[in-house]
Amino acid sequence: MNLIPEILDLQGEFEKIRHQIHENPELGFDELCTAKLVAQKLKEFGYEVYEEIGKTGVVGVLKKGNSDKKIGLRADMDALPLQECTNLPYKSKKENVMHACGHDGHTTSLLLAAKYLASQNFNGALNLYFQPAEEGLGGAKAMIEDGLFEKFDSDYVFGWHNMPFGSDKKFYLKKGAMMASSDSYSIEVIGRGGHGSAPEKAKDPIYAASLLIVALQSIVSRNVDPQNSAVVSIGAFNAGHAFNIIPDIATIKMSVRALDNETRKLTEEKIYKICKGIAQANDIEIKINKNVVAPVTMNNDEAVDFASEVAKELFGEKNCEFNHRPLMASEDFGFFCEMKKCAYAFLENENDIYLHNSSYVFNDKLLARAASYYAKLALKYLK
C-alpha cells in the first residue's frame, strides 16, 4: 500500500481520539459530545465550523485558491443501542450503548484527513460532512432538509464504511447499486374480537394477518424479476393475550429492501394491493404505515471512476475489488446519492466479527487507510 506518510505519522494521535469516542458512544441525534469534539478539532485545524446541521450534524469548510470546484467527504457519528461485550481497555462506559458499527472510526478517519489537508495546498472548497443518526433515523435526510447542499454544496460526495468480509482485498467499490434501499412497514389488521368458541361472530385478525404474511412472500417469488434483488422480511407479528379470546387487532412489522427503484416501487404497489385484497375478502380493515429508512445507495459512474483511480494509487490494483456484489443492507448515504454524484466504498476491517455485534472491534489500521483515501480524493480533485 502507498499510504500518505504524514498521515501514518499521525496514526497514534488519532487512535487515542477514536478510543475516546468509542468510550463515550452516543445514539442518533444525541451525539452532543461527539459533535462538540469534532467541532473543536476542526476549529483547531483552521476550518470554518457549522454546528447543529440536521440537529447534531457538523460541517467543516476549508477554502483555498480561487477555483469553483467543491468536494464533499462524509462520515457518520452515531452508535447503537447494544451492550458492549469486548474486553477492550477503552470499551464503552455507557450501559447498552456501543459503537458496534465503526462510526467512531469513520468520524476519526475524517478528522485525521482534515488535519492533514489543512496543511496542504489545493484550489477549491473542501466540505466535511459529519452526519448524525445514520442508524435508521435519517440523519442524512435531516442534514439535507436543513439546507446542507444549499449552504455547503459539493460537486461530488464520497463516503466509506468498514466491512469485515474476511477477504484478502482491502478496498471495494462498484458502479450502480452498492447497498439496498430500506423501507419499514407497520401494518394493523383490524377485525372484531370475540369468544374463541364462536369465531363466526368475530372477524378474526389473526387469521387475516396469517394470510397476509404468506401472501407477502409471493412478491419476491412471483412478482420480482429473478435477475433483480428484493427482500421482504417479517420481523414482528403480535396479537392477543389469551387462549380463548379472538383479539380485535393484529400487528405486523416488516422490512422491505431492493437494489433498484423500479423493484422498490413494484414491491410497494404489491404490498398495498395484497393488503386491500385480504381486507376485502375477510371483511376487515388494514392500515399501513410506511417509513423510508434509506434509498438505494446508487454510486455514480463518474464518481466511481475517479475514486477507483485514487484507490489503485493507494492500495494497489490487486488489493481492490471493483465489481463487488451489492449488499442488501442499507445506508442512508443513499439520500446523498439522490442529490449529488456520489461514490460509497467499503474498506476491509480484517475482523471475523460482523457489524452490529456486541463483540465487534474496529481495526485501527483503517484510520490511516481511510484518511489517505479521503485526502487523495480531495487533493486529486482540487488540484
Swiss-Prot record:
Gene3D superfamilies: 3.30.70.360, Zn peptidases. Coiled coil: none annotated. GO terms for molecular function: hippurate hydrolase activity. Cleaves hippuric acid into benzoic acid and glycine. The lineage of its organism: Bacteria, Pseudomonadati, Campylobacterota, Epsilonproteobacteria, Campylobacterales. Keywords: Hydrolase. The keyword tRNA processing does not apply. It holds the Pfam family Peptidase_M20. CDD domains: M20_Acy1-like. Belongs to the peptidase M20 family. The keyword Nucleotide-binding does not apply. Transmembrane segments: none annotated. This is Hippurate hydrolase. It comes from Campylobacter jejuni subsp. jejuni serotype O:2 (strain ATCC 700819 / NCTC 11168). It comes from the Bacteria. Its EC number is 3.5.1.32. Signal peptide: none annotated. It catalyses: N-benzoylglycine + H2O = benzoate + glycine.
